[in-house]
Amino acid sequence: MMQPNAKLLSPSAKFLPSPIEPPQHNRRTTVGAPPSLERNCKLSRRNLSKSSLLLLLTTQTTLTPLLDFSKAQADTIANPNLTNCENRIPTKKAFIDVSIDGEPIGRIIIGLYGDDVPAGTARFSSIVSGKAGITYRRKDFVKIMPGYVQHGGIRSYGVDAERATAAVGSLQNLIEEWERGKRGEICNVNKAGSVGIVVRDPSKPPPKTKLVARNGKLVVEEEVIAVGPNGTEFVITAVDSPELEDSVLVIGKVLEGMGVVEKMREVKTVRDNTSSPYFRVAKVIGDKRAVVAERGFNRPYSKVVVTNCGLIESQTL
């Protein structure tokens, strides 16, 4: 058999170009590259931290006024009557003269919101004028708090209490006006200089129930724990006191005499011991001594008394 000729198999081999060798890449490694990269990364992180902090501070500075404005706007939307608090016009004027340990300290003139809270204004007016047969005259301020002073009202359980209930209307009318304030239908904000009637005690626990046998049947009765406000106590605020909004119906504001309120706040009082663990335990277990002691907290050592009070007959309010 004939062997194939190599020249015939590749006749153009000599005309083919020689293969091109692939380029030789420089594979030398730089020893100093990783440290330099690490150093650059550290520098970037440091700069990033500074930039982030600056951005955070700038954002807070920019957004804080916006958040405050949004919160105020939300409060206004939730309770649109808050914007009308400053627009209320007093319809009556009343005055109370105050003394400390027999020394007169001045007169407080109060403007009453008869159009907004007619029941509360009518009750306060009847007592301050003596029209109901009872009066705040010669009655004491029983509590002096950092933000407000509180008058004890008519606390007698004799003829005065019966007259107070019969002559000035029921407490329920005041509670209904207070509930309107909670719903935002009327303004009931305890700003500095506000005057309000205490209508409820938010710290008073709900009445306990017990089973008693009556006429051969078991009947559920409520046990009265303590006597609540009777709608004759009132407070005068020296600073904004939102904590009072759960118990006080705002009926007016101080027009003159805030200096008298400040003098009353300077009177020394019985130290509030509600933070004591012993008092807390006694209160939890229902020790009556704790209840009695609590009534004495923040009471003035001096005798702070309303020496005279009444309505001011004036057409200009």
Curated annotation (Swiss-Prot):
Membrane spanning segments where? none
Q: Which reaction does it catalyse?
A: [protein]-peptidylproline (omega=180) = [protein]-peptidylproline (omega=0)
Q: Name one GO cellular component term.
A: mitochondrion
Name the organs or tissues of expression. Answer: Ubiquitous. Lower levels of expression in roots.
Q: Which EC class, in a word?
A: isomerase
> Is Chaperone there in the keyword field?
yes
Main location class: plastid
Q: What induces it?
A: Down-regulated by sucrose treatment.
- Residues in the signal sequence: none
As one GO molecular function, the record gives: peptidyl-prolyl cis-trans isomerase activity
Q: Please indicate which superkingdom the organism of origin belongs to.
A: Eukaryota
Q: What does this protein do?
A: PPIases accelerate the folding of proteins. It catalyzes the cis-trans isomerization of proline imidic peptide bonds in oligopeptides.
Name the family. Belongs to the cyclophilin-type PPIase family.
Listed name of the protein: Peptidyl-prolyl cis-trans isomerase CYP26-2, chloroplastic
Source organism (scientific name): Arabidopsis thaliana
User: What's the encoding gene here?
Assistant: CYP26-2
